[in-house]
Amino acid sequence: MSTVMNTQYRKPLPGTALDYFDTREAIEAIAPGAYAKLPYTSRVLAENLVRRCEPEMLTASLKQIIESKQELDFPWFPARVVCHDILGQTALVDLAGLRDAIAAKGGDPAQVNPVVPTQLIVDHSLAVEYGGFDKDAFAKNRAIEDRRNEDRFHFINWTQKAFKNIDVIPQGNGIMHQINLERMSPVIHARNGVAFPDTLVGTDSHTPHVDALGVIAIGVGGLEAESVMLGRASYMRLPDIIGVELTGKPQPGITATDIVLALTEFLRAQKVVSSYLEFFGEGAEALTLGDRATISNMTPEFGATAAMFYIDQQTLDYLTLTGREAEQVKLVETYAKTAGLWSDDLKQAVYPRTLHFDLSSVVRTIAGPSNPHARVPTSELAARGISGEVENEPGLMPDGAVIIAAITSCTNTSNPRNVIAAGLLARNANAKGLTRKPWVKTSLAPGSKAVQLYLEEANLLPELESLGFGIVGFACTTCNGMSGALDPVIQQEVIDRDLYATAVLSGNRNFDGRIHPYAKQAFLASPPLVVAYAIAGTIRFDIEKDVLGLDKDGKPVRLINIWPSDAEIDAVIAASVKPEQFRKVYEPMFDLSVDYGDKVSPLYDWRPQSTYIRRPPYWEGALAGERTLKGMRPLAVLGDNITTDHLSPSNAIMMDSAAGEYLHKMGLPEEDFNSYATHRGDHLTAQRATFANPKLKNEMAIVDGKVKQGSLARIEPEGIVTRMWEAIETYMDRKQPLIIIAGADYGQGSSRDWAAKGVRLAGVEAIVAEGFERIHRTNLVGMGVLPLEFKAGENRATYGIDGTEVFDVIGSIAPRADLTVIITRKNGERVEVPVTCRLDTAEEVSIYEAGGVLQRFAQDFLESNLK
């Protein structure tokens, strides 16, 4: 659990007082000439091994990289852990619970601390209760955030003082990924006299945002983050590394959002699941760092694990622009050029697979409904059935009404070109006399306070404010479902008329039900298009062709008349985006001095009435018991593309939900129910979110001969269809072991550990699916739930699974072993189903057998401290 470095291959780094590890020499000692052919990712992973791997494992591990083999697990030691306040807080609740468990067994709780530097940014808890047309929206939304989250923030403040090695950036300062890009990542570290590449894991699937800097940053679940925090290696096999050559240059008026939505469609079709992508070529070299970051941010939407760019002059220019010290920028250049991470040194890199994408093919685009990879060129809105006749009855909202238009998300607000484009479009629209439609709830929520400074410098913030896009917060807001309440009159009209209402946002996900319960569908668009849709007021509007309004002379105004030119965008950036703005924001923010005193108890004083923070139960009762994998009944039989939003939603809690009823019983007023996400530190609230998504389709929930959509289950053997939570409670009372049967891509979406915790607390012991998304599979293992995969070409339909059956798993559990699921049907017939055990490494088997990572931590800690 230490952070010890090796000594072999350690050398002085030319032109500095630092040392570095000469990975090239280590590779060449095994295979002369091999280093020049290695992809960027392989070089960074190899450096990590040379510096940290146990010497006796080094040669075998490096050979996997040199020979592009995937036969051996090797350790990876990320330099940092970054967390947001939902999963980060949940992880810290687990660590506080671990301290209690250690103390109960006679250990010293104060010894439980993160070993790896950990940064927690509070960005997920602000709801847009007041829209951007309210001049005091920011202050009002922040006050509500503090009131609703007092329990959570009390706990987070305690952790900052009680745990070593944790830095906390409090609420109201920005979004984790954008702060990571603009400030936290040094690209190259200088620690203990050694220079080495920044690498990290983050408790959010969009952590790869900083891959744009050439930093390997991957999203993990909270459980895996806890493991890394405590100094454990993250074991991996060499990932598939795919080169993506970008050619051509974007057409005039095309934004990075258009490019990334086109890439999302292209890469999803190319099946890049779990791979590390490396973008190169003339097209990649010409992209600004902001444009690269927009691309890297949407790595999970591609289905990939990482989306890397090489270090080059664009990287250095961006580090300078964002106020990094000149000495640090020089270190990045020196290290990259010495260690072979500079773009020129990668001309001979060989990729097992290379894809080609022409940037000049990209046209103006939105994505939706329902999926980020459902790309629609704006020139084809009518042909695709999205735009159509706009029915504007006086005094009523039109069909397809845009009820939310949000410039939001680190995906786009970390890119000055996208933000400035929105400001210029707003200025042009104001000059033509155009206005926002009154039913559109508009908001601007940048991921960094620097955005406000450069918009003010360019005199564009007032232009956005006059169209209702005032700053409502510096947080994730609408992008993670915290879009806040609608005007009650508008909401009632949506309900009464069963209106097809929509949201348009510059975010990265648009799954049904995610953005707002009353926005039936959502579309992703660039910030300037979001402004245009607020003026149009309906998704039925053909944004390229229809008339947005009449100017002061009565002439029709279309999108083309207000869209800013690339030259103007670039000129405004050159004049208005400055390093001192970033320094002014970040220097005070990172002046972190924490008093670690004897005054703070190492054990948290849990508040018994809290619905936000509660001592976790993972070391006691049934969760400490054995899983037999026998006599399991299905809790749900599900189709393809089940997301973590289905498994444990994040959005607002409704009174008629199981969690809402519980919070009401606990005395919370409905307006302070907050979101599911904010209650994940309290397992009693959070477990009631399991499968609580109203869009769930559980194939067992058959009513009148059809599958009924909703948070529903069927209790067996009675065959009673009921709300999911009532079914879970019934099975918990019976101590009935459960199983879930699912289709392909099970668990895609956010890296939400409660998507695994919830099913484990319900009594689920195994999940059989056609395929698992990477982070969710790891979380299942971390909770002691066995992931099993149907053999290729087989699925639930092959075996006619309807939910009346009982399931057993037999065979010896080992990495990727062949196991057998025995199905016993209602009539007594037994069927054998061959499956693959998706515990992929020996380390995962050991975690599973311990009951999960939290149980394993406690065992290991007590053993090491009682020796």
UniProtKB/Swiss-Prot annotation:
A further note on this protein reads: Together with PrpF, able to restore the growth of prpD mutant on propionate.
Q: Which UniProt keywords apply?
A: 4Fe-4S, Iron, Iron-sulfur, Lyase, Metal-binding
A Gene Ontology cellular component where this protein is annotated is: cytosol
Catalysed reactions, semicolon-separated: (2S,3S)-2-methylcitrate = 2-methyl-trans-aconitate + H2O; citrate = D-threo-isocitrate
Which cofactors, by name?
[4Fe-4S] cluster
One annotated GO biological process: tricarboxylic acid cycle
Family matches, as Gene3D superfamilies: 6.10.190.10, Aconitase, domain 3, Aconitase, domain 4
Species: Shewanella oneidensis (strain ATCC 700550 / JCM 31522 / CIP 106686 / LMG 19005 / NCIMB 14063 / MR-1)
Q: What Pfam families does the database record attribute to this sequence?
A: Aconitase, Aconitase_C
Keyword match Iron-sulfur: yes
User: The organism sits in which domain of life?
Assistant: Bacteria
Tell me if Ribonucleoprotein is a UniProt keyword of this record. no
MF-aspect GO terms: 4 iron, 4 sulfur cluster binding; aconitate hydratase activity; hydro-lyase activity; iron-responsive element binding; metal ion binding
Which NCBIfam families would you find in this protein's record?
2met_isocit_dHY, PRK09277.1, PRK12881.1
Q: How is its activity regulated?
A: Inhibited by ferricyanide and EDTA.
In short, the EC number is 4.2.1.117, 4.2.1.3
**What detail does the entry give on cofactor binding?**
Binds 1 [4Fe-4S] cluster per subunit.
Enzyme's top EC category: lyase
Q: What is this protein called?
A: 2-methylcitrate dehydratase (2-methyl-trans-aconitate forming)
Q: Which InterPro entries match?
A: 2Me_IsoCit_deHydtase_FeS-dep, Acnase/IPM_dHydase_lsu_aba_1/3, Acoase/IPM_deHydtase_lsu_aba, Aconitase/3IPM_dehydase_swvl, Aconitase/IRP2, Aconitase_4Fe-4S_dom, AconitaseA/IPMdHydase_ssu_swvl
What this chain does, per the entry, is described as: Involved in the catabolism of short chain fatty acids (SCFA) via the 2-methylcitrate cycle II (propionate degradation route). In vivo under anaerobic conditions, AcnD catalyzes the stereospecific dehydration of (2S,3S)-methylcitrate (2-MC) to yield the trans isomer of 2-methyl-aconitate (2-MCA). AcnD can also accept citrate and cis-aconitate, but with a lower efficiency. 2-methylisocitrate and isocitrate are not substrates.
